[in-house]
UniProtKB/Swiss-Prot annotation:
This is Hydrogenase maturation factor HypA. GO terms for molecular function: nickel cation binding; zinc ion binding. Involved in the maturation of [NiFe] hydrogenases. Required for nickel insertion into the metal center of the hydrogenase. Keywords: Metal-binding, Nickel, Zinc. PROSITE patterns: HYPA (PS01249). Ni(2+) binds at residue 2.
Length: 110
């Protein structure tokens, strides 16, 4: 489960950013195409925050839907995977516009 190491990295990033202050809430953006399972992050969060500045912090996860832009016709459309065809022209080449995000969006500290 790579979500455990991802959650540990999130905790480290938040602790550095908090500057020694207790963290009350963390907001993460997780894209639907990122390969990260939000439920698994939630499951790991309590264990990873034990005895840290984040212990007891609230975790908020904002999902970012996948969107692509067709490289043939330029149409932007929702995607669930990297090989979805363009709904306008049927071509398979696309550029991902959103959905690969995995970032700490907001940190609430004391």
């Amino acid at each position: 489960m790579h979500e455990m190491s991802i959650t540990q990295s999130v905790v480290e990033i938040c602790e550095k950013s908090a500057g020694g202050r207790r963290v009350l809430a963390v907001t993460l953006e997780i894209g639907d195409l990122s390969g990260v399972v939000p439920d698994a992050i939630e499951f790991c969060f309590e264990a990873c925050t034990r005895d840290t500045l984040l212990e007891g912090a609230r975790l908020v996860i904002e999902r970012v839907p996948g969107r692509g832009e067709c490289t043939s016709c330029g149409k932007e459309f929702p995607v669930r995977g990297y090989f979805d065809p363009c709904p306008a022209c049927g071509a398979y080449g696309m550029r991902v516009v959103s959905g690969e995000e995995l970032r700490v969006k907001e940190l609430e500290v004391e």
